[in-house]
Each structure stands twice: as structure tokens, then as C-alpha cells.
């Protein structure tokens, strides 16, 4: 038996661009007012790449380090003299004849030391308080610019069955599929070229069954939209260049009389010069970033994990002649092996694949009374995961038949589930610099 299925559709593209604050409101932040123009630190809900942020004061701090280095070299390595000279240069921007405007201060700094002239906007801006409370984010991209919304799904199924005898049948089944879609989980993901296959071999008879199956995943060319956009911005223009460019332009425009918002918009235009626009997701540059694993400085997540399962059960009623006592005895067991393989992009498996073994066994004894009016069952199972202590879970139930197709069921049971593979081993970097960590790494 063979079956095929193909589906194609237009996926939804997220278009909520509300400004989002990660530091106010609820524990996870909240949507706030403001656009890119009104908030230099704008972080759009479905805008990708604008999660990179910095305060202008921190940009000044890094520049200050460079200035001190140049002065120290000029004073033959004398750090004390360099600090004193820096204090004089900085003080000239605070008050005095050279603090009138940026042009005057730049000329003063150039006269003091020509090598320091490029640093004038940063010292002047800090001295005049232009950086206080100003945080700035990189310019991001809309989801429609980076994600292909065409969803595809192709499936093939097939099976072969062989009758060994009147009571026993063997079968081999295969299921495989591939496709593209857009997925929202801990972040927004473009799932492209995803592959999933399962192969099952089973032999079953009247009173017993044994089967084994293997599931294989392949994430294809899937990528994290947020991380990819941030790295794309860094590749086009590193933040170590973008922020100093923005800061210098911002001070220039503020000194020229522009208000805070207009100066910020103008400075962004200067810093964004040469920035690709439009459908960047189709560009070779973006694809190169999306093709590099997250663990190596790109946006691609890899998942070639596998699951192997062997399970069996046996109805021992006939073997032990329990039918004459109106009783049934069923036993079974299962063995699982997880092989996690994401090369450090999803799980904490940078050093190599992570294996997890899990097994379990169960038994159930049932007995019927009063011409099947009452059925009492006792069952229990024991499960063990190599990362956790074993657990025994019992169950007792009674079913009373009060009329045809009418029953009363009374039961007591316990249940337990081991943490999932992600609960145990996830190590995923998501938007805003947040990292999801499992309980075991």
C-alpha cells in the first residue's frame, strides 16, 4: 500500500509592529507606545534585528578608552599624565571658550593633538549631557522582508504486510515527509526543507505483539529569524562601527539645533547608509548568515535527532489457562533511545550527540464477577530514565455494569512523566538575548 499527499498554502506573516519594552510592566515585558521615530530604542514586536541595543553613554565609555590609549602613547606610557591631560581636554568641553559649540571644540582638540580630533563629538556630547538616558537600537526588518510565506508539505507513506500463518502477521511501514512553514515557539522560525521520516517493523499475533520503529528528523535549512537578522546587521555594518557613526552624527545634529527625535532620525540615516532594504531574505548575503549554525555565529538551527523504540506486549490469559477463572493477565515493556544531535544550536550538545535511554514494564490483572457485572483490574508499571530515578505507578479500577451500555467506573491511579528532551537539554538563544536552558546542562 502506497500513498502520496502534497499541500501548498500561503502562511501568515506576522505584522504587529508595536513597540515592546523588555524592562517594564510584566515579568516578560509589555507593548508600549512609540514608533521608530518616537523611540530611538524602538523594539518592534515582529521587527527582527532591532533587539541589538546600546546606550550612548556606553559608546562614549568605549571611546574614552581609545582616547586614553592615544594619550598614554603620546606621554610615553605615563598613564597618570594621560589621565590628567584627558581631564583638561574633557573640561574644555564643559566650560570655557572652547565649549561654545562642536566646531570650536573640534578645532581646540585638533590643535592639542591632531590624532584626537575624531573623538571630539563623543567628548563634547558627554560633557554637554547629550547622552544621558539615550538608548538606541539597531534598525530592524519586517517579517515580510526575511521570511518566505509559502508553506509546502509533501508526504509519502507505504507498507508491506505478510501473513506468516492464520494468527501471525508481519509488516513493514515507512512514512516520510518534507516541507516549509513559519513557526512560532520561543521565537519566530522559518522552517525550510524540514524532513521527518519514520520506519516501523511489526509482528503481531493473537495474543502477543512486538514492534520497533525509528524516527529521524532533519531541520533542513531552517533558521531563527531574530538571530539571523541581528547577525545580518552585524555583517552589513558591525555595531562597533554603526554606533560610533550614529553617536557622532547625533551630536553634530543636536549641536546644530535639532531636537532629540529629529537628531536621532537624521543620525540613523547616516549610520544606516548602504543598508540593504526590501526582500533581504532572498539575498545571497542573508542566506549566507542563515546557513551558518547558531553555535558558530549564524542563524541556522540544526536538528538531526533520532528516536528508536522497541515495545512488546503479551496476553498470558490462554497460556496460563486464566480464562476459566474469568481473569486476564497482560504484560508488556518498552525501550527507548533518544539521540539528540543539533550541534549546539538547540541542545547543549556542542561536544557531541547526547543519548538518553528510557525503559518501562507493566502488568495488568483483571477479573470479572457476577456474570461480568463487575470487573476489577489491578495494574502497575515501572519506568526508568537514565537521568532520573525509576518510578512505580499503580492503578486499581472497578467497572460496574448497571444496564446495557451503562457503566459506573471507580478508579485510583497515579501517573508520572519524565521531563522531555527539551526540558532536560535545551540550550537555545532566542530574541532579546534570552537563553532557554534545560535542567541538566
Task: Identify what each model region corresponds to.
Residues 2-8, 172-178, 210-214, 331-337, ...:
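Transmembrane beta-barrel strands of outer-membrane/channel proteins
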Residues 200-388:
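Face-selective signature of the C-terminal outer-membrane beta-barrel domain
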Residues 15-20, 133-150, 190, 223-229, ...:
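Extracellular/periplasm-exposed beta-strand and loop segments of Gram-negative cell-envelope proteins
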Residues 3-9, 151, 197-199, 204, ...:
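Conserved C-terminal beta-signal and adjacent last beta-strands/turns
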Residues 218-225, 386, 391, 405-441:
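Surface-exposed extracellular loop regions of Gram-negative outer-membrane beta-barrel proteins
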Residues 1-5, 157-163, 173, 202-204, ...:
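Transmembrane beta-barrel domains of outer membrane proteins
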Residues 153-159, 169, 188, 194-198, ...:
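Transmembrane beta-barrel architecture of outer membranes
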Residues 1-192:
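Periplasmic-side early beta-strands and strand-to-turn transitions of outer-membrane beta-barrels
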Amino acid at each position: 500500500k502506497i500513498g502520496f499527499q502534497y499541500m501548498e498554502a500561503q502562511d501568515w506573516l506576522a505584522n504587529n509592529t508595536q513597540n515592546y519594552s523588555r524592562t517594564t510592566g510584566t515579568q516578560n515585558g509589555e507593548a508600549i507606545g512609540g514608533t521608530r521615530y518616537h523611540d530611538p530604542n524602538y523594539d518592534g514586536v515582529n521587527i527582527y534585528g532591532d533587539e541589538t541595543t546600546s546606550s550612548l553613554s556606553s559608546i562614549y565609555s568605549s571611546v574614552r578608552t581609545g582616547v586614553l590609549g592615544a594619550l598614554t602613547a603620546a606621554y610615553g606610557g605615563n598613564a597618570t599624565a594621560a589621565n590628567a591631560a584627558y581631564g583638561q581636554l574633557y573640561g574644555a568641553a564643559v566650560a570655557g571658550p572652547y565649549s561654545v559649540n562642536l566646531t570650536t571644540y573640534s578645532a581646540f582638540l585638533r590643535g592639542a593633538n591632531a590624532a584626537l580630533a575624531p573623538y571630539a563629538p563623543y567628548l563634547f556630547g558627554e560633557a554637554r549631557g547629550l547622552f544621558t538616558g539615550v538608548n538606541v537600537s539597531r534598525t530592524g526588518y519586517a517579517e515580510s522582508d526575511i521570511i518566505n510565506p509559502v508553506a509546502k508539505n509533501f508526504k509519502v507513506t507505504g507498507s508491506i504486510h505478510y501473513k506468516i500463518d492464520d494468527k501471525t502477521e508481519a509488516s513493514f511501514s515507512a512514512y516520510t515527509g518534507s516541507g516549509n512553514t513559519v513557526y512560532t515557539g520561543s521565537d519566530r522560525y522559518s522552517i525550510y526543507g524540514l524532513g521527518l521520516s519514520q520506519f516501523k517493523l511489526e509482528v503481531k499475533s493473537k495474543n502477543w505483539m512486538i514492534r520497533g520503529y525509528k524516527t529521524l528528523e532533519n531541520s533542513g535549512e531552517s533558521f531563527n529569524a531574530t538571530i539571523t537578522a541581528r547577525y545580518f546587521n552585524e555583517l552589513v555594518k558591525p555595531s562597533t562601527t554603526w554606533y560610533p557613526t550614529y553617536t557622532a552624527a547625533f551630536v553634530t545634529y543636536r549641536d546644530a539645533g535639532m531636537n532629540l527625535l529629529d537628531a536621532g532620525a537624521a543620525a540613523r540615516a547616516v549610520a544606516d547608509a548602504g543598508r540593504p532594504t526590501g526582500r533581504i531574505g532572498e539575498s545571497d548575503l542573508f542566506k549566507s548568515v542563515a546557513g551558518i549554525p547558531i553555535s558558530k555565529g549564524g542563524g541556522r538551527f540544526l536538528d538531526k535527532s533520532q528516536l528508536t523504540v522497541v515495545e512488546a506486549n503479551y496476553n498470558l490469559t490462554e497460556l496460563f489457562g486464566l480464562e476459566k477463572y474469568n481473569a486476564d493477565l497482560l504484560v508488556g515493556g518498552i525501550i527507548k533511545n533518544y539521540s539528540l544531535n543539533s550541534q549546539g544550536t538547540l541542545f547543549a550538545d556542542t561536544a557531541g550527540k547526547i543519548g538518553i535511554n528510557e525503559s518501562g514494564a507493566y502488568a495488568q490483572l483483571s477479573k470479572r464477577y457476577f456474570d461480568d457485572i463487575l470487573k476489577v483490574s489491578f495494574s502497575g508499571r515501572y519506568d526508568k530514565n537514565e537521568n532520573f530515578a525509576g518510578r512505580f505507578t499503580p492503578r486499581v479500577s472497578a467497572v460496574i455494569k448497571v444496564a446495557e451500555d451503562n457503566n459506573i467506573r471507580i478508579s485510583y491511579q497515579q501517573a508520572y512523566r519524565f521531563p522531555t528532551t527539551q526540558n532536560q537539554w535545551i540550550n537555545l538563544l532566542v530574541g532579546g538575548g534570552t537563553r532557554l536552558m534545560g535542567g541538566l546542562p
